[in-house]
Regions:
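Amphipathic alpha-helical packing segments from all-alpha helical-bundle domains
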Residues: 130-146
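GST-like domain detector, emphasizing the conserved glutathione-binding G-site
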Residues: 1-130
Length: 146
């Protein structure tokens, strides 16, 4: 089993944490990143998003893409310890909270930190350190220098 994706991605880290909790063995490839895609990555995920999981080396054409799908696969592969509740209402709520974290929270953090700071620095540009006027909290990004 091979997990692909940049270690700074919160979605990759989510899959890594679930794999660790499930005590799953896997190979890790950090190369796929929005800053540079391996030549063959589009065959694995045509959308070029991370993480991606290749569950079986003997089936290179089968990939699971999206952190929630990967975590659900891990849950079925190794049911214990259970990371999702078994009761229907609690399970539905857990899936909803996961979706809120994946879409709303990740988008806000990405807009405030990853895009203006890490992506700029990785591309050799200065970090864009300014108060974000769209932030409802008036969050300021603190200067990061290497």
């Amino acid at each position: 089993m091979k997990l692909l994706g940049a270690p700074l991605s919160p979605f990759v880290r989510k899959a890594v944490i679930v794999a660790a909790e499930k005590n799953l063995d896997y190979e890790y490839d950090p190369r796929p990143s929005p800053l540079g895609w391996p030549e063959d990555f589009e065959k694995i995920n045509p959308l070029k998003r991370i993480p991606a999981l290749l569950p079986d080396a003997d089936k290179p054409d089968f990939a699971i893409n999206d952190s929630s799908a990967i975590c659900a696969y891990f849950e079925k592969l190794q049911p214990e310890p259970a990371l999702y509740p078994s009761a229907a209402e609690a399970y539905g709520r857990a899936l909803w909270l996961e979706e809120v974290a994946d879409t709303e929270l990740a988008n806000k953090v990405g807009m405030l930190v990853f895009r203006p700071v890490f992506f700029n620095l990785a591309a050799g540009k200065p970090a864009d350190i300014a108060q974000n006027p769209k932030s409802p909290c008036g969050v300021c990004i603190i200067r990061y220098s290497s």
